[in-house]
Amino acid sequence: MTIAFQLAVFALIVTSSILLISVPVVFASPDGWSSNKNVVFSGTSLWIGLVFLVGILNSLIS
């Protein structure tokens, strides 16, 4: 169970780092938002899911 928690936290950190870089780039590009809207929403949905997963796994471990 601890390994699953650590992997979920690692995935959350990686996803956060990717979104931290990619979202401002998408907004700064001239046609970025209209062409990459689905990618931003998918990344955000993945991030929210990982936040809930880490919370659930944390409550099971401690």
UniProtKB/Swiss-Prot annotation:
InterPro entries: PSII_PsbZ, PSII_PsbZ_sf. This is Photosystem II reaction center protein Z. May control the interaction of photosystem II (PSII) cores with the light-harvesting antenna, regulates electron flow through the 2 photosystem reaction centers. PSII is a light-driven water plastoquinone oxidoreductase, using light energy to abstract electrons from H(2)O, generating a proton gradient subsequently used for ATP formation. Belongs to the PsbZ family. Keywords: Chloroplast, Membrane, Photosynthesis, Photosystem II, Plastid, Reaction center, Thylakoid, Transmembrane, Transmembrane helix. Its main location: plastid. It is a multi-pass membrane protein. The chain crosses the membrane at residues 8-28, 41-61. One of its GO terms (cellular component) is chloroplast thylakoid membrane. PANTHER family: PHOTOSYSTEM II REACTION CENTER PROTEIN Z. Signal peptide: none annotated. PSII is composed of 1 copy each of membrane proteins PsbA, PsbB, PsbC, PsbD, PsbE, PsbF, PsbH, PsbI, PsbJ, PsbK, PsbL, PsbM, PsbT, PsbY, PsbZ, Psb30/Ycf12, at least 3 peripheral proteins of the oxygen-evolving complex and a large number of cofactors. It forms dimeric complexes. It comes from the Eukaryota. SUPFAM superfamilies: PsbZ-like. It is found in: Plastid, Chloroplast thylakoid membrane. One of its GO terms (biological process) is photosystem II stabilization.
